Amino acid sequence: MKETHYSVGLDIGTTKIVAIIGKENEYGKIEILGIGKAKSLGVHRGVVNNITQTIESIQQAISQAETDSGLKIDTVSVGIAGQHIRSLQHSDYITRANAEEVIGPDDVDNLCNQVYKLVMLPGEEIIHVLPQEFKVDGQAEIKEPIGMYGGRLEANFHVVVGQVSSIKNIVRCIKSAGLKLGEISLEPLASANAVLSQEEKEAGVALIDIGGGTTDLAIFKDGIIRHTAVIPFGGNVITEDIKEGCSIIEKQAELLKIKFGSAWPGENKENEIVSIPGLRGRDPKEITLKNLSKIIHARVVEIVEQVYVEIKNYGHDEQKKKLIAGIVLTGGGSQLKHLKQLVEYITGMDTRIGYPNEHLAGDSEEEIASPLYATGVGLLMNAVASDAKYAPEQPALEETEEKGTEEQNTEETKAPKAPRKNIFDKWSEKLKDFLDNAE
């Protein structure tokens, strides 16, 4: 019987933890084999603040995904997010010993390793070194220098930095939940892979991923990551505003936001009222949808304006840096009614909602194609793309060993030849090694 491979993406968010099991089908699409969800109780604004609760939530999501798929989860691809993440631009160069030899992968590795040695602020660690453009002997705008001749190799890098303690806590939760660490990605980059097309990345696009605890931004131009940022506000702060503004409990505030919430107050009439049941026999509380929308609008405007400042800081106003493809909204917060129209009004940029369905097989559940699961699908795609992280299919639950003797007599299949690692695989391994040793 032909061995089947599958991979797992684990999205550790502020409001939910999602485990998605999938594999690549013969058409290059992702086939979803199982999904598990759990309420996230130990994460605040993308950062673990309760180890025990986070471990329990991870185990619950993993167990549910195993039951749903009938498969055993061993290794997971995870994301890094949170307000501790920051990014910077850096240029560096190396002088090659022999300019008569063509530039090889080792030369690019040496240049990247040099960037990893940069001294950061106390308690910070470089977690991503992403090349943007290379120069060879002064010749600029080179995307791939390998195979060229030259003595001086330069590059511009987008460097992502994280807080060591925050990263260690995620690693500890993964390992304490009985899992191995596979692919590691900055979450907005994972979401971008799931919802953006290559054409959008080439034309210039800003991905805004509105999660429960944070709003993440990733800007692409000419197919290259140009800017990343984390805004420390997400859907949860909107819920908190509704809770305080309407004097109701958090659960009621969240339901109000989902069912009746709108980012555009003008859409609601003054006489539209919703009644909220009172607590322990108290009288019901009446709330006008107009007032509800005003509360939501005020916070959403604040978030969008902060994101727009980041977009302008990148240089969107410059003709050369213009984001022709506009803005793509994703994440659970992107489902807020009239948010798209408000973003277009504030920024003046074309905006669409990003769904991770383009890369999914046609028979995938409709639920998984929601913007809510963009990061999880992106993390799964990263795991699937790395052959080294594939795991053989095996039952999740205990089974009888009747086939044990029979299987011993079957002819061993030859192990497939490992593909040659490119520089991106090596950078991922470097980050993985750092996280594995972070305890």
Predicted features and spans:
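A short acidic Gly-Thr/Ser loop motif
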Residues: L10-K16, I80-A81, L207-T214, F220-G223, ...
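Nucleotide/phosphate-binding catalytic cleft detector across ATP-hydrolyzing
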Residues: M1-T14, I20-V76, I80-L207, G235, ...
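Phosphate/pyrophosphate-binding loops at sites that engage ATP/ADP/AMP, CoA/4′-phosphopantetheine
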Residues: I62-D74, V304-A325
